[in-house]
């Protein structure tokens, strides 16, 4: 494994451990970003289960024929995730950006989730 991958993996693990400790029992909104799509899920770490999830791969997102690798797709995923989390009764979460910078698609997803009712 290259030095960059090792450093990235350590950072991810460190961030997640800090979030679990300081989360106060709140679910975690985890973001994964690939070059073509973006995925997000709300995870209850105490029970070890996913409460809600959304991605740019879903059929409702792909109908427009757009790519999942842009800011508009990230906003749509954030809005959809917040709606699904609200259906499950989740209002407050801890944002887990992993090793990604809070910029671009990650920021757009977070802002859309906030506007749709999630607080973090």
From Swiss-Prot:
<keyword id="KW-0694">RNA-binding</keyword>
<comment type="similarity">
    <text>Belongs to the universal ribosomal protein uL18 family.</text>
</comment>
<keyword id="KW-0699">rRNA-binding</keyword>
<keyword id="KW-0687">Ribonucleoprotein</keyword>
<dbReference type="InterPro" id="IPR004389">
    <property type="entry name" value="Ribosomal_uL18_bac-type"/>
</dbReference>
<feature type="compositionally biased region" description="Basic residues">
    <location>
        <begin position="8"/>
        <end position="23"/>
    </location>
</feature>
<dbReference type="GO" id="GO:0008097">
    <property type="term" value="F:5S rRNA binding"/>
</dbReference>
<dbReference type="GO" id="GO:0003735">
    <property type="term" value="F:structural constituent of ribosome"/>
</dbReference>
<comment type="subunit">
    <text>Part of the 50S ribosomal subunit; part of the 5S rRNA/L5/L18/L25 subcomplex. Contacts the 5S and 23S rRNAs.</text>
</comment>
<keyword id="KW-0689">Ribosomal protein</keyword>
<feature type="region of interest" description="Disordered">
    <location>
        <begin position="1"/>
        <end position="26"/>
    </location>
</feature>
<dbReference type="InterPro" id="IPR005484">
    <property type="entry name" value="Ribosomal_uL18_bac/euk"/>
</dbReference>
<dbReference type="Pfam" id="PF00861">
    <property type="entry name" value="Ribosomal_L18p"/>
</dbReference>
<protein>
    <recommendedName>
        <fullName>Large ribosomal subunit protein uL18</fullName>
    </recommendedName>
</protein>
<comment type="function">
    <text>This is one of the proteins that bind and probably mediate the attachment of the 5S RNA into the large ribosomal subunit, where it forms part of the central protuberance.</text>
</comment>
<dbReference type="GO" id="GO:0006412">
    <property type="term" value="P:translation"/>
</dbReference>
<dbReference type="GO" id="GO:0022625">
    <property type="term" value="C:cytosolic large ribosomal subunit"/>
</dbReference>
